């Protein structure tokens, strides 16, 4: 069975984020099982409805940006918003184990904003719906838990990191003379080089599929 990491980009998430200052608190009751740890499900971010509304996360996915206490090390947790109006405004709760592992503490200040990108792993029968699709094709977002949206395939790569190219037909793996990305970034104008790449079609050998949410 294929094992795909689906990377989802949201083109309508503003690059200049609407940032909400929040207190991030670890909660041992929040789910953090193997499905979350292995990337099959997003971590849970619990907050009240007013906090959620401030960032306008229309797909219910948000990112918390934090700094490890006493350092300049940045830590991000991207997860699924669960509304709980028993939680105070401008407070976000995440699994305590996850927070301590990431930051070394169970409570700290953070910045909350609408996620620009996230990823979900699938390795069950849903993978069969993607095999054979090509760069530029679209599939239903429900495959990765997104309702009422289509995801457009922008590219991908295999387990050796060789990228898919839209101009190479089929599910092939071969060396191609390239003058630009993906697969080759020339250092000089006009430079060309033969590089190993993947074709434009998803096969079981692909491990990452890059997608973008399509808005009508």
Swiss-Prot record:
Record GO terms (molecular function): structural constituent of ribosome
GO cellular component, one term: ribonucleoprotein complex
Keywords: Ribonucleoprotein, Ribosomal protein
Keyword Iron-sulfur attributed: no
Superkingdom classification of source: Archaea
Pfam families linked: Ribosomal_S6e
Range of residues in the leader sequence: none
InterPro entries the record matches: Ribosomal_eS6, Ribosomal_eS6_arc, Ribosomal_eS6_CS
Biological process, per Gene Ontology: translation
Disulfide bonds: none
Family indicated by similarity: Belongs to the eukaryotic ribosomal protein eS6 family.
HAMAP family documented for this protein: Ribosomal_eS6 (MF_00512)
Name used for this protein in its record: Small ribosomal subunit protein eS6
Underlying gene: rps6e
